[in-house]
Each structure stands twice: as structure tokens, then as C-alpha cells.
Amino acid sequence: EELNSIQEFSSISELPGQKKYKFAIRGNPSLGNIKTLMIGVKNPSTQLGDALCGEVWFNELRISGIDSQDGWAAVGALDGNIADFATFSATGRYSSIGFGSIDMTPNERTREELLQYDIISNVNVGQLAPQKWGLQIPLSFATGETLITPEYDPFYQDIKLEDRLNTAERQSQRDSIRNQSIDYTKRKSVSLIGVRKNSSGGGKRRFYSPENFDFSYAYNESIHRDYEIEKQEEFNLLMGSNYGYSFSSKPIEPFKKVKSFDRKKYLQWLQQLNFNLLPSSLEASVNVNRILNNQKFRQVYLEGVDASLQRSLPNLQQRNFLFDYNYALNHNFSKSLRFNFNAATSSIIRNNGMAEAGVMNPFQQDKNALWQGILNTGEPNNHIQTFSLNYKLPFQYIPFLSFVDATYNYTGNFNWQRGSEALSQVVSDDGIPLGIVNTIQNNNTKTLTTAFSFSKLYSALGLKSNSNTPFNRRVQAARAVNDSLSKKKNSLLKVGLTKLVDLMTLVKRVQASYSENNGSVLPGYLPSVGFAGGLQPTLGYTLGSQADIRYEAARQGWLTGFPNFNQSFSQMHSSKFKASAQLIPMKGLIIDFNADRDFMENRLENFKVEGQSYVPRNSNVFGNFGMSTILLRTAFNPARGSESSNFENFRSYRLKIAERLVQNTPFEGMGVNEEGYPVGYGKSQQEVLLNSFLAAYTGENPNKIKLTPMRGTPLPNWNLKVTGLTDI
């Protein structure tokens, strides 16, 4: 029967019995993709509205004869070593089709055959050299393969792979079917990590000694193919070298042996003066990371399809060649003053540039391409350098200030980021290309941390507080003292002095810190950075200085003159102050005070460079401000029913605040609006609402409150803890 044109519900009278209809599916679908079966009933009536009555039975649809073929699996491992010279490890694994745990259903068992092995070996090649050389050469080699053969053909998922192979007419067909069905992965790696010369104890290590260096090398290779990917190759080359040396110089103390300072405690700080001429440590590292990836998707083989008529799929290649280096210098100028400098540069080796120079074929897919131009350091893509200075103020050497501990820290950061290659092709209306425009940014952080340990101060002054005595014992002691002192004339004076000492030693600890962060971002910067970093645009800028460099950079020709350049110059400033204090009047009673103030301001500005002159355009300033305050005066104000008296004050204060704000402004004398508020300062104006809220909830007079929310001094919050009630 011709099935090219099948009419739905076609009547087939030749079918035996009561089967009058035949349903068919056009094409060759895979039964493995069936998720749902639908059964329908056809209405045989040809007249609408006919009364119908029928009974339909659907027997249970069940799959019978499930193949519950069992499988097996095995795992093997072999470990060996040759003393401490070499180690060897090999593992193998096999599992057949149908393998699974005893509680798995037939459908949950594996539908593939797995064969896998891995071999790993480590050899300390340095032991082959004389021991006095002190060579450390750890060689590692690893290889492995994984072969996964499915039970069913990946394309015809309802046909077993073995059956399809048996029906193939030629050996070449069987090879093509088998090759596209098997999931195959091969791995190989060779590495030399931490090659170095250890100290043999023969002499003092110098900054140029070979013991300060170590070298690393690693090569990784992976080959993979499966049903979708005809071939995927990934080659990875890693090389690196590190240098590190710590100078062992003693600090110079010019006044340490001056004996006259020993008898004068206020001059003893001179004995502690010290400085170092040599840095503390010097570090550097270089890393090469090259990745080459070749991939080609598979053109699936099908019987009856001429492969020569199919459009070939392209080879995809991805290369990522990186060259990174960094260095660090640490110098303890003295025991209290420490200096650190770090710089890191990441470079990209451009493939196009190498092809133009004849170094590499840009379409070369062989792994030997990893070694082409190995000495090429590429073009800088990102440069970061950090400068930090830490100073511990010498209060501990001053007798009357020894209870103060203070530290100042300064950190300056500089970053150079290369511009986008894609955006460099943008052309203005006048035909001027944008080119490579870089971005520079810097910031600095200043932090001053201070702690006051009043227990040291009280001890130095000879004051001893009774606040550590439990409350009930103090009561008993006070009664005993009163009984004994009542017999003396100076009893009241002694009791008063005791109370005075307790009052003077209430404060146990005070801490305060202030930090400030400033930064700027300048886009459109044209110069690159040198191999060892950069000192442009100025030395101060690279160390975090916020001196304005925009006009000087434009005058020097360092900023792009592209007429359609629209990236913004930005500046940021933030400051944070925190303070805390702890009072302990008696044991079990602790009062903590905390105050803080935060301020942040950002400024964005568009600009244009005309004739090497910086021309600022529109700018935008925004920020945040927060400060602790005390609301104790209004926290317990009574409420009138569902109305809050503080909120009512807030509403009524708005007119008074608005009348004060309009003074000495262009809106003064312009009258009032329909609600009685001055023009420009309505009842919902931001400044009116903010100052009215502060006056209402802090309990201040709206006619006297400062009309600026950014006040200088924060008011502390407090927390009261009572833990000594059980001692009463």
C-alpha cells in the first residue's frame, strides 16, 4: 500500500474483523524518544446531536519481556615504589552493559560498556646527581584513556549498536559507525614542579645564589571524540620561575649604648631609634600559560547519504597565550615603619602580530605551535601596583602616653587597563578611528587606629578602683568601713576620696579609628606601560595621589582627541569614623558607647580634548551620609491615641524650616504657594523634610537647628548591661 499520502482515519475495508481504520506515522522515528502514548475514540455519527451510548474498554498497556541482562564490573590497582626515588601507581576499571547494584531496576543499570585506565609515576631525578649538588628535580608523568561503548546506536536510539554494525555492508561503513558511536578520551601530562637547588650548608646564601630560584614546567594534552565531536584536541603549556630572597641585616641603633639615657625615662625613646639600610625581602615571578584548542564537529554518517555532497564543517581553533610577571619589595625601615611594594602585569601574545612577523601560521593546528615565539612577552593587557606604608606611633616609649596604642597605614593603588581591540575600529563622522584607548585609575586609603588602655594609666597614677568588687561585698565593706571610720575624724574625707577614685576610674577602654578612601578613573589614556611597570602620568599618581592630572595629561597629548569619545572621568571620596568606649562603675554593670560617621561622594564628568586642552562638560555629583545620633529626648514622648506626637511635630516644623531655608536664596521674596510654603521650598521638598525630621526626632528647636544634615560630630549610642544581680 502506498503510504506517501495517508489520510487521517482512512477507512481500510480489507482489514479483517471489525478493524476498519489504520493509523500510521510517516518517517522513521526512534522508539527510544517516545515519552507519551495517546488513545482516542472516534465518533461514528454523521449527524450532529445524535444520542450516543457506548462502552469503551482500554486494556492495560504493558511492556513485556524486559531484558534484565546482568553485567559485571572490576576495579584493579597497583602501587609500587623504589625507596624514595620513584613511585608508581596504576588503576584500571571495567564495567559491562547491564551492570548495576542489586536494588536497581533494569532501566537504571548501565547501558554502556566502560573501559578505563590511569598510570601515574613520580621520580626524583635529582637523586641521580651528587648529593652535594643539592638538586631537587621532581618529575611526574601521567597518562590515561577512557573508552565508552554504548549499547544502542546514538543516532538510531532504538537499534542496538551491534545490530547496526552487523547490517553494514562494508568494513568502511562499520568503521565509520563504530568511530562516531564510541566516546573516547585520552589524557597525558608531564610536569617538573619546583625544580631547585637546595642549600648544602657550604656557605652563606647571597641574593644572587641559585638557591633563591625555582623553576616549573608542565605539559598537558587531551584528545577527545564522541558522537557530536569528530575531534577535540587541547594542549596546555605551563612554565614558571620564582625568585625570593630575605635579607638578614640587623637594624642600626645609634643611641642604644648611650648610658645617660638610662637614667632619664623621658629620653629612653631615643635608645629605641633604629633603621635598616637593606630591604627585608625581594620576590619576583614569571609565568607562561599557553592553551591551544582545536575542535571539529562531526558530520554524522548515514546509510544512503553521499558524504561528498555534504557541506564540510569548519575547524575551530582557540588560542590563549599569556605571559604574566610580578615582583614585590618589602622594606622594614625600622621596627615601627614598614614599606611594601607589589606590581603585577598580565600580557597577551597576539596571534595576528605573530603571523605578520612570520613567527606562526595563524591556522597551524599542531601542538608545536605552543613553542613558536616562546620568547615573545606580548603586549601588556593589565597592570596593577600597590604601595603601602605602615607606621606604629612610638607612644609606648613616652611614660605619660604609654597607655596609648596608635597605628597609621597608607595604601596607594594604581591600575592600567588596555583598551578593547574591537572598539579600536570605531570611526567618527569625520573618518577618524578611535584606536586603542586605555583606562588608568588609582586610589589611596589612609587609616588611623587608636586604642586607649586606661587600666595602664590608672596603674601608673597609683589609682586602684573598687569597681571589680562584687556589689554585696562592697555593701558589707562599706558598712564595716563606716563603723570603723565613724570613730575617726577624717572618716568622711576617706569615704569621699574612695568615691572619687571610683568615679575617676569608670572609663576602662576607648577605641577610635578614622579611614579615608580617595580614587579617580581616567579613560581615554593613550600611553602604554613599561615592562617593569609605569611611572606615568606622574609618580605621585601611581602612588595614589589625588592631585588633578587631567589638564597636564591633555597638554602632553596623553588623552584621546576622538570627537565622539563619551566615557566619563570619575572621582570618589569616602571617610569613616568610629569610636567606642566602655565604662564599668562596678562589677556586673557595663556601659558601652558607640559613635560612627560615614560620608561618601562620587563625581562623574564628561570631557573633550580640543587642541591638547582638557575641556570639561556636564558633571554629576551624588553620595551618601550617615551618622549616629541620640533620640533619647523624644523616644518616650507620649502618643495621642494612634497619633505620634513626634510625627505631628515633624509635620508642623516643615513650614518653619522652609522659611529659614528660603532666606538668602534666589527664591527669597517670590511669595508663597497655595499651601502657604515659600516658592521653591514646598512641604515635600527634600531639604525641608530632612531638617524637619531631625528637629522633631532629636528634640531640637526648629528655629535653631543647623540646616545641614552633615554635621561634624556624631552623638554616641549606648548599651547598658547588668550581669551582677545574682550577687546581691
Predicted segment positions?
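Extracellular beta-strand ligand-recognition surfaces/modules
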Residues: 1-51
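Exposed, low-structure sequence patches enriched in small/polar residues
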Residues: 46-728
